[in-house]
Amino acid sequence: MNPTLPTDSPLLSRSMIAVICAQFLSAFGDNALLFATLALIKQQLYPDWSQPILQMAFVATYIILAPFVGQVADSFAKGRVMMVANGLKLAGALVICFGFNPFLGYTLVGVGAAAYSPAKYGILGEITSGEKLVKANGLMEASTIAAILIGSVAGGILADWHIVAALAVCAVVYAAAVIANLYIPRLPAAHPAVSWTPRAMTQAFFNACVVLWRDGQTRFSLIGTSLFWGAGVTLRFLLVLWVPVALGIADNATPTLLNAMVAVGIVIGAGAAARFVTLETVRRCMPAGILIGVAVAIFALQTTLFNAYALLLIIGVLGGFFVVPLNALLQERGKNSVGAGNAIAVQNLGENTAMLLMLGLYSLAVKVSVPVVGVGIGFGVVFALAISALWLSQRRAK
């Protein structure tokens, strides 16, 4: 089966449904595994500052593999690349489940995730195009966030009950994702590789970086999404330490439920972006980005669970409205210049470098005993200022 799918097919085509289902299962496993592994390292009495180190090892794989994964995604059928990547995630989950070093196992999951990301987003541009691509990104983000919502909560609740059972569920879900990938049509390679030598691949990747960075629109998208996801992953770990201090709750489930509220909000915001923002009006999303930082600073001061839920829902809505148009812009312009897989690999490099830097600063702040509420306020203010600066620079460029 080697069809070239028409990009004018209905949005909810068989191919799109297969991609969305596979993505849901894979993202569910990622998020359940994170919270199950955090519970495991807490049980094994690792220090608090080691929690973000777990995620830093994960994102470091994205940075190291960035020159290679885009070419892999563009040189093979993307559905099969996604299947192999989910197989690597399954192997990492089994490493943790069978009692080996959790940092090693989670790093292996990171290798799978790094290979998976360019393929999962790049395939959207092969089965749809134009304004449908914004809507397809909305579906992808909604599927991902629904998986974050259910996976995070399931991981936290199962870990409170039985940590090994939680890890086993993650392995089963990854196995289901591998099977789901078999139903994605085998599409022709988008940009077959010229060379597979590491030097040539690295040179080609950095050439793609230069091409995208010189384009004002894609540079704008790269910076915006990098700031957003760097902030998002840091907020996740902030919640783990903030909940016991601000709310006096010490279980594993509450931080996952709070993260779930962000997920619900992103689904709503992604839907609003698909309705009100087009590729020609991407700058409409920028005020939402600034308000994310303001809302995070206000959130850090809360002392009641209801207010925390409400503010995190608002943060999620703003986040979905902010990031979906930027993703679509990069994919649309990137697929015509360097290939969708390479464009997403460059985006992953930026996003994960931002994550690594922000998590490193957060881990340092925790290690030197900066109050977690103060960390939250400072984090929100700096994010709002960064997005404001990005917006002003884009307006001046126009």
Swiss-Prot record:
Pfam family, one: MFS_1
Keyword Transmembrane attributed: yes
Keyword check for Cell inner membrane: yes
Annotated localization: Cell inner membrane
InterPro entries (UniProt xref): LysoPLipid__transptr_LplT, MFS, MFS_trans_sf
A molecular function GO annotation: lysophospholipid:sodium symporter activity
Protein topology in the membrane: Multi-pass membrane protein
Entry-linked CDD domains: MFS_MefA_like
Keyword annotations: Cell inner membrane, Cell membrane, Lipid transport, Membrane, Transmembrane, Transmembrane helix, Transport
Transmembrane intervals: 16-36, 53-73, 91-111, 139-159, 163-183, 195-213, 227-247, 253-273, 286-306, 310-330, 344-364, 372-392
A GO-annotated cellular component: plasma membrane
Chief location: membrane
Top-level taxon of origin: Bacteria
UniProt function note: Catalyzes the facilitated diffusion of 2-acyl-glycero-3-phosphoethanolamine (2-acyl-GPE) into the cell.
Similarity remark: Belongs to the major facilitator superfamily. LplT (TC 2.A.1.42) family.
Name of the protein in its database record: Lysophospholipid transporter LplT
Annotated source species: Serratia proteamaculans (strain 568)
Lineage: Bacteria, Pseudomonadati, Pseudomonadota, Gammaproteobacteria, Enterobacterales
Gene: lplT
